[in-house]
Amino acid sequence: MYYMLIGFIIVVIAVIGAGYILKRKHYQRINELEEKKIKLRERPVIDELSKVKKLKLTGQTEALFESWRSSWDEIETRLFPDLEEVLLEAEMNTDRYKFRSATHAENDIEQMLVVIEKQMDQILGGLKELLISEEKNAKESRATKEKFAELRREVLTRGFKLGETLPYIETKLSELSESLNSYDSLTDQGDHLEAREIVIVVQKEMQVIEAQMERIPSLLHETDTILPEEMTKLRAGYEEMVRKGYYLAQMELDKEISRMKNQIDKMKKNVINLDLDEAEQGVEELHNEIDLFYDTLEHEAEARHFVKENHSPTSDKLQRQNAVSDALAEQITEVKQTYHVAEDDLAVYLKTSAKLSEAKENFEQLTALIASGEIAYSAAQDTLKEIDAALITISTEQDKFAEELRSLRKDELEARDDAERMRRAIITLDRKMERERLPGLPEEYLSLREHMGESIDALEKRLEEKPLNMKAVSQDWRIAEEDLTHLTEKAEEMMENVRLVEHVIQYANRYRLRNKELADELVQAENHFYNDYQYKKALEIAVTALEKVETGAFKKVEKAYESKVSVDDIE
């Protein structure tokens, strides 16, 4: 019983302690919210409203002021009283240990303080802007009026430089003057915000007019003086070159100058209408066009020099190439008596001959046009370059064809010499095989030997044809060379096999008396060797038989053969 009482007392003390701590925390938060409320009440909203109220307000400014004052009245008469009630509710809930209700109330207070602070910020910000606007308007209006007066004076003193744009500029200035009068009227009435907007617009308009007054004189100078003078100089240069014999009708300068004059008239209208960007673009484009005409005249002068420098050399090239072509024609006639010339090859010559005739005709026409002054030198230059390029191509193709004709005789002699060489090679090969003392020659080799002779016969027969077809000769020549190579390889292989068979059988004889199977297979190999001359097959049988008795023996025999060591010395 005693311990239960002690436990109960401890629980009571703990509850009271916890309640005290929570109560203290809530009072601390309520005090912080109270301090924030006091700080908001101390903000100088009423003072600022009083300052602005002393100003003479009308229109938009007055409407804004009334909205700010209504907003403050709402704060004073509704929001702050509501805030006080919720603060009181929070204190009461804390005193009664209704901590959850107290927390809700405290959260509501925080939200209400945020709303009040935001509303007060809007009021003070608007009032401050209005006061600054009134002061700034006063300063900027003086500066704006001074700048306007300067523009007026500049128009009076420099108006002659503005030409026909002067009435438009004066109209703009009159409109700005009316705007400034409206500014004064609105300021007197107390509508400072709307007056501020007028000042800003007038400042921007004056900047535009000032920039226009800077650009207009130079644009008028371009359209009235510089561009007309440039066109006059262009025409003078054009006419001087025509007097010197240049053909320039392709430029159609009269038509182009008339068009450019119309462009200048259009640019002047753009300047008068103050479309200065478009006018500047037009001036730049027209200068570029005039520069292009000068480039054309300069190109014609350079082309004339080129034509005078290259006309005679081109004529000489034509004559030389014509002589080469005639000589090639004679060479073709002579060659055709001995050799067959393919139609494709003749077509190449005929094509180059036609190109040469065309180049000659173009040159004659060009010469006539230059003499009569009916062609621009630039066009004449292009034609000369085309003729020169054609002559280079013709020369290359005809030289190549001439070399092919000259090579026919050379190729014929080489083919005849090679046919003789191949016959000697066969005789040499036959003698070599005789020295080997072969048991005989297999049918396969004899067939190749016969075919080789037929290939040389075909080549020699082809070389006796009239006219001689060197393409066919080359084909037969190639076949004969391939056959000789094949025959030589077969002969070398056959002689190699014979030597190896002899070495293998000689080495295998050491086992012959002791091994009947080996002896029988060696007899079989010898039959192929001596009777049907199948030396490769004889080698295969002998090697297989020997390897059954002594593995690796063939490698030893082969090595001894390559080293020219006697079989008897192989261990």
From Swiss-Prot:
<dbReference type="Pfam" id="PF06160">
    <property type="entry name" value="EzrA"/>
</dbReference>
<dbReference type="GO" id="GO:0005886">
    <property type="term" value="C:plasma membrane"/>
</dbReference>
<feature type="coiled-coil region">
    <location>
        <begin position="248"/>
        <end position="298"/>
    </location>
</feature>
<dbReference type="GO" id="GO:0000921">
    <property type="term" value="P:septin ring assembly"/>
</dbReference>
<dbReference type="InterPro" id="IPR010379">
    <property type="entry name" value="EzrA"/>
</dbReference>
<keyword id="KW-1133">Transmembrane helix</keyword>
<feature type="coiled-coil region">
    <location>
        <begin position="326"/>
        <end position="374"/>
    </location>
</feature>
<keyword id="KW-0472">Membrane</keyword>
<protein>
    <recommendedName>
        <fullName>Septation ring formation regulator EzrA</fullName>
    </recommendedName>
</protein>
<comment type="function">
    <text>Negative regulator of FtsZ ring formation; modulates the frequency and position of FtsZ ring formation. Inhibits FtsZ ring formation at polar sites. Interacts either with FtsZ or with one of its binding partners to promote depolymerization.</text>
</comment>
<feature type="coiled-coil region">
    <location>
        <begin position="478"/>
        <end position="529"/>
    </location>
</feature>
<feature type="transmembrane region" description="Helical">
    <location>
        <begin position="4"/>
        <end position="22"/>
    </location>
</feature>
<dbReference type="GO" id="GO:0005940">
    <property type="term" value="C:septin ring"/>
</dbReference>
<feature type="topological domain" description="Extracellular">
    <location>
        <begin position="1"/>
        <end position="3"/>
    </location>
</feature>
<feature type="coiled-coil region">
    <location>
        <begin position="400"/>
        <end position="437"/>
    </location>
</feature>
<keyword id="KW-1003">Cell membrane</keyword>
<keyword id="KW-0812">Transmembrane</keyword>
<keyword id="KW-0717">Septation</keyword>
<dbReference type="GO" id="GO:0000917">
    <property type="term" value="P:division septum assembly"/>
</dbReference>
<feature type="topological domain" description="Cytoplasmic">
    <location>
        <begin position="23"/>
        <end position="571"/>
    </location>
</feature>
<keyword id="KW-0132">Cell division</keyword>
<keyword id="KW-0131">Cell cycle</keyword>
<keyword id="KW-0175">Coiled coil</keyword>
<comment type="similarity">
    <text>Belongs to the EzrA family.</text>
</comment>
